């Protein structure tokens, strides 16, 4: 026997029930009871759209952080008031991007540098002084010793240059190494006479 086609036959909630047991009053309630999850989502989405951010979770997180900090755009006005959502987005994002680096990033860097400069350097210098056990007089002596050593080195270097010149002047024909070997500057024998002459 053929049953007449019923509107509710395809619905999941009516599959296990005979047609007689399905009451029209219960149908409306069961639909409402099953939909609260979906309606809750749509309500949240509706709120999000009012804020000017439809559907993007990352943008919503940014907006939530702005609300925690104290609304930056207008404290009493909702963001989407009188403007379409597409116009509200570009204004909120650049402002947030401009303000955050100015507030957070730069001062932290400056604070860190000043803290390092003031705190660490005196501690380090005090520790060094304690390790060395040096007084101001000893420090002056060390500085004097260092300057003397540098002067002596300069004198030795200058004298070394003069000694080399004196050797050439004294013994112009003294042998200075392997000149006949190939690979030495001058190609070996080609410039032998030029090296031996003290002044050209």
UniProtKB/Swiss-Prot annotation:
Keywords: Nucleus, Phosphoprotein, Transcription, Transcription regulation
Positions where Phosphoserine occurs in the chain: 30, 65
Compartment(s) of residence: Nucleus
Biased composition (Basic and acidic residues): 37-50, 65-80, 96-107, 115-154
GO annotations of cellular component type: nucleus
Keyword Cell inner membrane set for record: no
InterPro entries (alphabetical): TF_A-like/BEX
Bias kind Acidic residues: ranges: 20-36, 51-64
Main location: nucleus
Location of region: Disordered: 1-200
Function noted in UniProt: May be involved in transcriptional regulation.
Family per record: Belongs to the TFS-II family. TFA subfamily.
Protein's name according to its UniProt entry: Transcription elongation factor A protein-like 3
Source species of the chain: Homo sapiens
